[in-house]
Amino acid sequence: MPMQGAQRRLLGSLNSIPTATPNLGLAANHTGAPCLEVSIPDWLFLSLGLVSLVQNVLVVAAIAKNRNLHSPMYCFICCLALSDLLVSGSNMLETAVILMLEAGALATRASVVQQLQNTIDVLTCSSMLCSLCFLGAIALDRYVSIFYALRYHSIVTLPRARRAIAATWVASVLSSTLFIAYCDHAAVLLCLVVFFLAMLVLMAVLYVHMLARACQHAQGITRLHKRQLPAHQGFGLRGAATLTILLGIFFLCWGPFFLHLMLVVLCPQHLTCSCIFKNFKVFLTLIICNTIIDPLIYAFRSQELCRTLKEVLLCSW
């Protein structure tokens, strides 16, 4: 979808609405009714992207450096970091190009801008799909490690993990290319929304089942040592809180973006929906925030990875 004016984002395939005006306040929609419009300054957007970029580069470097981390689980974590890196990097590139075009520092033909837009769209969409896929893969890997502990190393082997990773990247790039090529079709956007909901349900079911098993295990230990029940209840509450935070962050960071896509299909001309469309950059910013949070949840909690990360940082100095 071609750009119309300097205020259009390059990510026009998934958003045909102008970006927010440079303040937080009430803007008028087509009928003059107030419409809340939140602005994300470019410097803040680029800063968050840079933090995400640095974090995820460090995760990839640490896993690549330490052979002890070349297991299927860490391969999935590495690919999650790589896809998050591409999500933040592609959005930073898009913002930088827009700023240069607006400032007149980059002069090029409309056809070149269109090709660049399509390339960034495919890169962004494929990296987002990969990020969601690897979040699901990490949940599935943990599920197998708990419920099939004795057979885990025969089920989740490194060759199988590598084949699954390669298939995920190829499928994401191919599907993203098709999505961008046929972005005007409602079925394409609905497919993306359904995919997000499927990943959300998959993660919720797996993690809830793991929490239930962990509570049963804690209850068994409590009975074995004849300890009081509140200790088990406390464990259950902590586990439920952790699960709520994990799934809550995922839903809060990704949900608004896919809600935007769903509303584009359901009510593209509705006045209330048009107000939501104006905050598209906020939804992208939430996804960037998720790429910052992912390493904190999945990578930096590993002592082995943190030790390797310190070595990487010391070597870089």
Curated annotation (Swiss-Prot):
Where does this protein reside within or beyond the cell?
Cell membrane
An example of a Gene Ontology BP annotation on this entry?
adenylate cyclase-activating G protein-coupled receptor signaling pathway
The protein's UniProt keywords, in alphabetical order, are: Cell membrane, G-protein coupled receptor, Glycoprotein, Lipoprotein, Membrane, Palmitate, Receptor, Transducer, Transmembrane, Transmembrane helix
Main subcellular location of this protein, as a coarse class:
membrane
S-palmitoyl cysteine-type lipidated residues? 315
Residues spanning the membrane: 38-63, 73-93, 119-140, 164-183, 192-211, 241-266, 280-300
Q: Which residues lie on this side of the membrane: Extracellular?
A: 1-37, 94-118, 184-191, 267-279
Query: Glycosylation: which residues?
Result: 29
Changing residue 100 to L has the effect of: In strain: Isolate 3
Which regions of this chain are Cytoplasmic-facing, per the record's topological domains?
64-72, 141-163, 212-240, 301-317
User: How does the record classify its membrane topology?
Assistant: Multi-pass membrane protein
Source superkingdom: Eukaryota
GO: which molecular function terms? melanocyte-stimulating hormone receptor activity
Phenotype when changing residue 17 to T: In strain: Isolate 3
GO-annotated cellular components: plasma membrane
| Entry similarity comment | Belongs to the G-protein coupled receptor 1 family.
Function noted in UniProt:
Receptor for MSH (alpha, beta and gamma) and ACTH. The activity of this receptor is mediated by G proteins which activate adenylate cyclase. Mediates melanogenesis, the production of eumelanin (black/brown) and phaeomelanin (red/yellow), via regulation of cAMP signaling in melanocytes.
What is the annotated quaternary arrangement, including any partners?
Interacts with MGRN1, but does not undergo MGRN1-mediated ubiquitination; this interaction competes with GNAS-binding and thus inhibits agonist-induced cAMP production. Interacts with OPN3; the interaction results in a decrease in MC1R-mediated cAMP signaling and ultimately a decrease in melanin production in melanocytes.
Q: What is this protein called?
A: Melanocyte-stimulating hormone receptor
Organism, scientific name: Alouatta seniculus
Name of the coding gene: MC1R
